[in-house]
Amino acid sequence: MNALEQNRRSFLFAIGGLGISQALPRGIARAQAAAPQGYVLGATEGEQLVHFRDHGKIFIKVGSATGSNNLALGTQQVTLGAGIPIHRHLQMDEAFYVLEGSGIFILNDVRHSFEKGGTVFIPKNSWHGFANPDHELLLLWIMSPAGLDGFFRDTCTPPGVPPKQLTREQINEIARKYATEFR
């Protein structure tokens, strides 16, 4: 995507005056229309967001906006030292595949080391989080049913748009909407 397309997209998201299919990134509107039959997205297609807390990149490939209610899939960059706070999903199983980096994974208060190529499975209702004091992380995440993608849409912003300034209470309220709780 060229700079002009990115600036245009950022502007459209900022004014919020268009319907979702008109404002979605390249490939997502096509995927949304094709969801009942399935779809194929290229490497640069999908919904790109910037995390509200650590400004890491999130790339949603499959989720509720593309017609999948049973599965969400994407990648998340976790910047050096940012970690992921302890939380749980009341209705969703979650899995991570570590594409880059290493750190400590906390699952129900037990600490586990992980590294590139590792896999983490989290059954619903399990408290979990990450610490990455030495490396930036790139994680592939899968949720079933979909839901995490909606949390990201409600808390994060497209590239080029200022991050949302959310209070802990606002984050917890949004999390509850997606059957998620933070400690």
Regions found by a protein language model. Name each.
Residues E47-I86, M92:
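A short glycine-rich, His/Asp/Glu-containing loop-to-beta-strand
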Residues V78, Q91-F105, I142:
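Short, conserved beta-strand element in jelly-roll/cupin
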